[in-house]
Amino acid sequence: MKIRSQVGMVLNLDKCIGCHTCSVTCKNVWTSREGVEYAWFNNVETKPGQGFPTDWENQEKYKGGWIRKINGKLQPRMGNRAMLLGKIFANPHLPGIDDYYEPFDFDYQNLHTAPEGSKSQPIARPRSLITGERMAKIEKGPNWEDDLGGEFDKLAKDKNFDNIQKAMYSQFENTFMMYLPRLCEHCLNPACVATCPSGAIYKREEDGIVLIDQDKCRGWRMCITGCPYKKIYFNWKSGKSEKCIFCYPRIEAGQPTVCSETCVGRIRYLGVLLYDADAIERAASTENEKDLYQRQLDVFLDPNDPKVIEQAIKDGIPLSVIEAAQQSPVYKMAMEWKLALPLHPEYRTLPMVWYVPPLSPIQSAADAGELGSNGILPDVESLRIPVQYLANLLTAGDTKPILRALKRMLAMRHYKRAETVDGKVDTRALEEVGLTEAQAQEMYRYLAIANYEDRFVVPSSHRELAREAFPEKNGCGFTFGDGCHGSDTKFNLFNSRRIDAIDVTSKTEPHP
């Protein structure tokens, strides 16, 4: 057993209001520069819908994630090394700019320079940020399907409608929607790492954050196809790939990510999980896709177990990280209460950004008296959002974990409503779903109140264990350019503008 730690995230979809604050703040901090105008490290999608980029969940089209071969071994869906090499100069599974959107701005200067007395109202026409040319029509945007914007024929192409009679949901009275904030999953078994020909992508040992080395990246873009969540973007200015960095400078300082800090709905939770690195391959190679969720749970370790603590210390896990894992809200939601579920575990990447399924539209329908009940709780299988749809999204089609999570949330609400409104303690609903009163009270505190100190339990990094970064900063500078690879050629395979790098190598004493 080899114990490692990972900073994970849980998003409570039951409270997401779709305000896009997380997307805007992330955009302003990380991708408000030339070359990545179209890139959104964090975006909020409305489901049902095809998402951003279009149809990103269709792995028959994009070939992302892993597949299990007949011999039980894993292989990138793109193919083996020889197949990857054969596609290196022409990747047919790469999303194009039209699958995202052509970034644009408006000719606001035209409003200022329009002559007085003009017979027509001056307008600010859209202009492409890539070509600089005027655009006749804006065809798409990052939230083009926001709030079910668009006809149902396009929304019905959502892959999560598989095995569902989706025709009935085209009728107004059966319409449903939910918000799905998405960011890089920082997987335990990342396919992007395996498909990068340059070996530029790596997973940090201390916190599990997946990063791209901008010095090593050569812009092959195989990682974009390899990532099943399509959360890696190509910077056409620098010729490099970029992705969500989980705000690691903030994480190292013990602070939450920008998207978590600015979330007005308090839906995001950050915490440490301890896991067995030796069990990753066995879990990801599980034959039945519906068992992948449980196999990933088996990878996580109990931070309160004395044997786990002893082994973690031997494996170099600091005590502060172990203590943070014992108070982790992510561990409580994923392991103890089993409310949080992984996004598309069938991709076999073992994602580490999990989601609590939405309950609000279901509960409102139950309050209206339109639904039957199953014992104390409403019959969740007959409620507004199809359980099978949520299962296709979060548990590879297995409805049992979805039903358990929804019933436990309903039971907690039933218990607290009886306590606060009726002034009595009614534990029948809790007993029905296997919860204690103490667990229900704690769930209420974390889900409803969601205090800052409960949502974010992030240990600061141990800088005494890190190598001094000043020589690297002095020699190269922390830039998004070509880095210090020492190239002096002007040839560019992808016909994009490159930033000339200055070859400066710092001389430092060897680290003891």
From Swiss-Prot:
From its record, what is one biological process in GO terms?
nitrate assimilation
Residue ranges annotated as coiled coil are none
Q: Where does [4Fe-4S] cluster 3 bind?
A: C184, C187, C192, C227
What is the enzyme's class at the highest EC level?
oxidoreductase
Swiss-Prot/TrEMBL keywords: 3Fe-4S, 4Fe-4S, Cell membrane, Electron transport, Iron, Iron-sulfur, Membrane, Metal-binding, Nitrate assimilation, Oxidoreductase, Repeat, Transport
Report which superkingdom the organism of origin falls in.
Answer: Bacteria
Q: Which GO terms describe its molecular function?
A: 3 iron, 4 sulfur cluster binding; 4 iron, 4 sulfur cluster binding; electron transfer activity; metal ion binding; nitrate reductase (quinone) activity
User: In its keyword annotation, does this UniProt entry include Membrane?
Assistant: yes
List the Pfam families hit by this protein, alphabetically. Fer4_11 (PF13247), Nitr_red_bet_C (PF14711)
**Positions of [3Fe-4S] cluster binding:** C196, C217, C223
InterPro entries for this protein: 4Fe4S_Fe-S-bd, Nitr_red_bet_C, Nitr_red_bet_C_sf, NO3_Rdtase_bsu
First-listed, main subcellular location of the protein, grouped into a coarse class: membrane
Task: Identify the residues that bind [4Fe-4S] cluster 1.
Answer: C16, C19, C22, C263
Q: How does it sit in the membrane?
A: Peripheral membrane protein
Q: How is the cofactor bound?
A: Binds 3 [4Fe-4S] clusters per subunit.
List the catalytic activities from the record. Answer: nitrate + a quinol = a quinone + nitrite + H2O
Q: Where is the 4Fe-4S ferredoxin-type domain?
A: 7-35, 175-206, 208-237
The cellular location(s) given in this protein's UniProt record come to: Cell membrane
* Subunit comment: Dimer of heterotrimers each composed of an alpha, a beta and a gamma chain. Alpha and beta are catalytic chains; gamma chains are involved in binding the enzyme complex to the cytoplasmic membrane.
Q: Per its record, how is this protein called by name?
A: Respiratory nitrate reductase 1 beta chain
